[in-house]
Amino acid sequence: MGVDTMGNMFFTRPGEDSDADPVYMGSHLDTQPTGGKFDGVLGVLGGLEVMRTLNDMNIRTKRPIVVVNWTNEEGTRFAPAMLASGVFAGVLDQNWAYERTDAKGKTFGEELVRIGWKGDEPVGSRKIHAMFELHIEQGPILEAEHKDIGVVTHGQGLWWLQVTLTGKEAHTGSTPMRMRKNASLGLGKLLQLVNEIAMAHQPDAVGGVGHIDVSPNSRNVLPGQIVFTVDFRSPNQATLDGMKARFEKEAPKIAEELGIGIEIEVAGHFDPVTFDTGCVEAIRNAAERLGYSHRNIVSGAGHDACWVNRVAPTAMVMCPCVDGLSHNEDEDISKEWASAGTDVLLHAVLETAEIVS
């Protein structure tokens, strides 16, 4: 097994042609604070199951096959998301990534060393013929339409904006309404603005706020500061940028009307993704040959495959999840869905890695 300087882990099954670029498959093992047990994990375990099946069946391939576990995909502790795959793809600077800090001021680089997973292999030095990522949909479409497989053609781009509102701490009971500099009121109005912006770009755009930090967070104190993160996503570049631009234009006006301060900073960004046609067709062909119901789908979430797609042909296989629920401890899938997704992954990889008879 190889480990690079960002902690990405690679397990290789040799091919008959040692000079041929490998076919990769995998995902991530990190999770959300209250995340489920299939987000990311399915893709890594599915890759290992493919590897085990090839060994059990004594199937040889021309190209080596690699299972990869990408580090810090979620970006929960160390923002942004897909940090290590972003460095691998040359999108993010490695030293910048090492300097990302958590809520306690500890850096990603320091913690990578502490847990013993800062490898010696230079990040991004590996050649990739193609990569496939198996993942749960994290949405309700496949289950609602009774589809076994989602053939992912595109990935949504996103803008994460960190917004800091500065009001004035004051007693909630004795401060007259007209004399307040109320950051929490600003939060409420900006939450509504985020929703309005997303609803103006239906059916594909989404917008929301998932993180809110209120200070001092006391029941009878008007907050002096509120920090929250806006998440805008769309598969269309113009729409995505337009959503960000409208928020940046209108949010300061709302803050000014309330007499509170506002700062808006970019916390994360990537452009919409179009996955490789050949890899997408390999997935679709596998689903059709195996008799699984399927449909094209756009990934609403960001994935490591979105970054890797910049340096190698890439595509994704998706399977349904119960009620579309993800980033939740109740996240669940059926054995049949997991089996179908892994089966399609196996055959797409074999088509690409070329079976040696």
What are these regions (language model features)?
Residues 1-36, 54:
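Acidic/His- and Gly-rich active-site-bordering loop/insert found
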Residues 2, 26-27, 294-344, 349-352:
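Zn-dependent metallopeptidase/amidohydrolase metal-coordination segment
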Residues 4, 60-64, 119-124, 174, ...:
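Flexible, glycine/charged-enriched surface loops at secondary-structure junctions
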Residues 7-9, 29-32, 65-76, 138, ...:
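Acidic, glycine-rich active-site loops and adjacent beta-strand->loop/helix elements
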Residues 25-28, 34-74, 159-165, 171-197, ...:
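Alpha-helical metal-binding/catalytic segments enriched in His/Glu/Asp
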Residues 73, 77-238:
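Midchain, well-structured core segments that form catalytic/ion-binding scaffolds
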Residues 95-96, 233-236, 267-269, 324-338:
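Short beta-alpha connecting loops at secondary-structure transitions
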Residues 210-217, 229-236, 261-280, 300, ...:
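A short beta-alpha structural unit
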